[in-house]
Amino acid sequence: MNYLIVISFALLLMTGVESGRDAYIAKKENCTYFCALNPYCNDLCTKNGAKSGYCQWAGRYGNACWCIDLPDKVPIRIPGPCIGR
């Protein structure tokens, strides 16, 4: 019986958890996607697996796309310089 519990717990740990986060979606160079309209960002975010997205006007990184519930595998803007400029 104890083996069954241990094996079940091990399988639970090995499957991993796919979580989402709200953040600025970023290019490989740590640069945000410039935007002017919400539909552009919503399309970009949903194509990358987010629930939705919108254009954050005059935000921390200027006019940039903000995604809601973005998967962990998609790069987000982190503190530091944008290397591609």
From Swiss-Prot:
<feature type="domain" description="LCN-type CS-alpha/beta">
    <location>
        <begin position="21"/>
        <end position="83"/>
    </location>
</feature>
<dbReference type="Pfam" id="PF00537">
    <property type="entry name" value="Toxin_3"/>
</dbReference>
<comment type="function">
    <text>This protein markedly relaxes the rat carbachol-precontracted anococcygeus muscle. This relaxation is inhibited by the inhibitor of nitric oxide (NO) synthase, N-nitro-L-arginine methyl ester (L-NAME), suggesting that the response induced by this protein is NO-mediated.</text>
</comment>
<protein>
    <recommendedName>
        <fullName>Makatoxin-3</fullName>
    </recommendedName>
</protein>
<dbReference type="GO" id="GO:0090729">
    <property type="term" value="F:toxin activity"/>
</dbReference>
<keyword id="KW-1015">Disulfide bond</keyword>
<feature type="signal peptide">
    <location>
        <begin position="1"/>
        <end position="19"/>
    </location>
</feature>
<feature type="disulfide bond">
    <location>
        <begin position="41"/>
        <end position="65"/>
    </location>
</feature>
<dbReference type="InterPro" id="IPR003614">
    <property type="entry name" value="Scorpion_toxin-like"/>
</dbReference>
<keyword id="KW-0732">Signal</keyword>
<feature type="disulfide bond">
    <location>
        <begin position="35"/>
        <end position="55"/>
    </location>
</feature>
<keyword id="KW-0800">Toxin</keyword>
<feature type="disulfide bond">
    <location>
        <begin position="31"/>
        <end position="82"/>
    </location>
</feature>
<dbReference type="GO" id="GO:0006952">
    <property type="term" value="P:defense response"/>
</dbReference>
<keyword id="KW-0528">Neurotoxin</keyword>
<dbReference type="InterPro" id="IPR018218">
    <property type="entry name" value="Scorpion_toxinL"/>
</dbReference>
<keyword id="KW-0964">Secreted</keyword>
<comment type="similarity">
    <text>Belongs to the long (4 C-C) scorpion toxin superfamily. Sodium channel inhibitor family. Alpha subfamily.</text>
</comment>
<dbReference type="GO" id="GO:0019871">
    <property type="term" value="F:sodium channel inhibitor activity"/>
</dbReference>
<dbReference type="GO" id="GO:0005576">
    <property type="term" value="C:extracellular region"/>
</dbReference>
<dbReference type="InterPro" id="IPR044062">
    <property type="entry name" value="LCN-type_CS_alpha_beta_dom"/>
</dbReference>
<dbReference type="InterPro" id="IPR002061">
    <property type="entry name" value="Scorpion_toxinL/defensin"/>
</dbReference>
<feature type="disulfide bond">
    <location>
        <begin position="45"/>
        <end position="67"/>
    </location>
</feature>
<dbReference type="InterPro" id="IPR036574">
    <property type="entry name" value="Scorpion_toxin-like_sf"/>
</dbReference>
